[in-house]
Amino acid sequence: MIHITLPDGSQREFAGPVTVAEVAASIGSGLAKAALAGKIGDKVVDTSYQITQDSPLSIVTAKDADGLEVIRHSTAHLLAYAVKELFPDAQVTIGPVIENGFYYDFSYKRPFTPEDLAAIEKRMAELAAKDEPVVRRVLPRDEAVAYFKGLGEHYKAEIIASIPTNEDVSLYREGGFEDLCRGPHVPSTGKLKFFKLMKVAGAYWRGDHRNEMLQRVYGTAWATKEELQQYLHMLEEAEKRDHRKLGRELDLFHIDEHSPGTVFWHPKGWTLWQEVEQYMRRVYRDNGYQEVKGPQILDKTLWEKTGHWDKYRDNMFTTESEKRDYALKPMNCPGHILIFKQGIKSYRDLPLRYGEFGQCHRNEPTGGLHGIMRVRGFTQDDGHIFCTEDHILAECTAYTALLQKVYKNFGFHNIIYKVATRPEARIGSDESWDKAEHALMESLRASGCEFEIAPGDGAFYGPKIEYTLKDAIGRQWQCGTMQVDFSMPERLDAEYVGEDGGRHRPVMLHRAIVGSLERFIGILIEEHAGALPVWLAPVQVAVLNITDAQQDYCREIAAKLQKALPNQGLRVVTDLRNEKITYKIREHSLQKLPYILVAGDKEKAAGAVAVRARGNKDLGVMSLDAFVDLIAQDIASKV
């Protein structure tokens, strides 16, 4: 007898080997129809998988995350099936699942056109409607190589040839198409109903620029029609909010071909940058951080000690001078330890908090660059806390509360918390890991946060908390981090004198709130669709005249506004052009300015202004003092 244990703890007995599909059918016809795969322990398997021993089993349906993964994987194969039907000369390569979808790479004699994509998607729908069974078979490696060579699929043959000779490989067939794959897959093509092809891009075979350029077709697939429509709507909204488009339209920044992956900030964009940086500088100052500044170029011997030269060298920009090798720093941490090591530190000095707006460089591949979100040169609000194990809980609790306040001030209220715990390969004692993991979790509980645990996802040198923002259209951005580090102080020989008079290693806490300022500003632009809160807006007020008769009055208003607030000048422009007032209002509205002040003869005579708020809201005529009170309240409340 074989005993199958279901998720609710109940058991079912079978006389002999049984498939996942048969177990599902024994539970109910509805479940049998909905079954996409099975999960035995942590392994997801086909519904045709035969269970030969006592096992725990859950039936995977479209409602499960694993089910969605199977749908997307299978839809990638359906895409390849459709391409081979329409373009028999095309060669198939690989087709993995990615976030929110999948892609498949093809080798073909000409680029696919938008019309081709529409035809491929239509053919996919037709093949899905046939509800053809998806059948798995296993071949010895050499036989599989010969099989795909016989089909003229040289890329597939090359992939299989790289597999050890003693391994078998699995193939999946649907209709007239068969593909190499580990699986699992849906039981039939009829399970694939809600998908859309998105775009075509270039991709080098095996990611190597020396190889052939392939065509990568991207698609998305979902469990329901509603989810697909929601996703497509989110993409439409994201396109409107694209920081690259808004950065150009609002004259904030540009990326130039003369320096790929680095940002040229325009005056208005640099004003926004300065507002973010100066705000974070006040956060440092008000929370016990000492701001420091380290050099950008450091000798390779330092990077050898930290392990970066061995593990991360390909992502570092290097140079040579006087027979010494140097690297542009990809991170600030080693520099902060070198500062910590200057002079003797006592336990009374701990916790010691350093903060730096450190400029870092990482040699990201060109294909991975994305506006100001993914760059090669960036500045971090990088902080490091040197402390003892006993300090970790209090420091993490204070940091989480601070992070929540900062995110709220920037307009983010939805934060996802995740604790990444010890991996198998790690340094440090179990006692130290127990203490650190407990401190991270307790700090989140003390802050009233619900959190996920990601077992084994911590770094080899310590556990961490990841803080992820959820934006206005549901996208997630991992920005904040609190990383415990037992390793780097050891590698770089950092010490403090303990209460016992002996030498001790400090624990190092790596922390960032906004992370890369470039990326965070990109997130801000997209979160607010360019309509930044008043306190961040590069231009807060535009003063417009109706006729030349109000020019001097408008200049007078602008001058008063620039001096209206103590310790803070309002950012004001005047527009005195001889243009229709409706034209000028529209132009400044498109720049998403918080306020537009209009002055005609009536306003001039009354010593007042007509106020228009963003979103075409007419607030009527008010005195200049009343307007100053209004905008001061906006700035103070960070709206």
UniProtKB/Swiss-Prot annotation:
GO CC terms in record: cytosol
InterPro entries listed in its UniProt record: aa-tRNA-synt_IIb, aa-tRNA-synth_II, aa-tRNA-synth_II/BPL/LPL, Anticodon-bd, Anticodon-bd_dom_sf, Beta-grasp_dom_sf, TGS, TGS-like
Domain of life: Bacteria
S-S bridge residues: none
Coiled coil: none
UniProt keyword Metal-binding present: yes
Cofactor mode of binding and number, as noted: Binds 1 zinc ion per subunit.
Chain residues that bind Zn(2+): 333, 384, 510
PANTHER family found in the cross-reference section: THREONINE--TRNA LIGASE, CHLOROPLASTIC_MITOCHONDRIAL 2 (PTHR11451:SF44), THREONINE-TRNA LIGASE (PTHR11451)
UniProt cross-references to Gene3D superfamilies, sorted A to Z: 3.10.20.30, 3.30.54.20, Anticodon-binding domain, Bira Bifunctional Protein, Domain 2, Threonyl-trna Synthetase, Chain A, domain 2
Name of the protein: Threonine--tRNA ligase
Signal peptide range: none
Function recorded in the entry: Catalyzes the attachment of threonine to tRNA(Thr) in a two-step reaction: L-threonine is first activated by ATP to form Thr-AMP and then transferred to the acceptor end of tRNA(Thr). Also edits incorrectly charged L-seryl-tRNA(Thr).
BP GO terms, sorted: threonyl-tRNA aminoacylation
EC number of the protein: 6.1.1.3
Keywords: Aminoacyl-tRNA synthetase, ATP-binding, Cytoplasm, Ligase, Metal-binding, Nucleotide-binding, Protein biosynthesis, RNA-binding, tRNA-binding, Zinc
Similarity comment text for this entry: Belongs to the class-II aminoacyl-tRNA synthetase family.
Quaternary context: Homodimer.
Annotated catalysed reactions: tRNA(Thr) + L-threonine + ATP = L-threonyl-tRNA(Thr) + AMP + diphosphate + H(+)
Compartmental location: Cytoplasm
Organism lineage: Bacteria, Pseudomonadati, Pseudomonadota, Betaproteobacteria, Burkholderiales
Pfam families: HGTP_anticodon (PF03129), TGS (PF02824), tRNA-synt_2b (PF00587), tRNA_SAD (PF07973)
Enzyme class, broadest EC rank: ligase
Domain TGS: 1-61
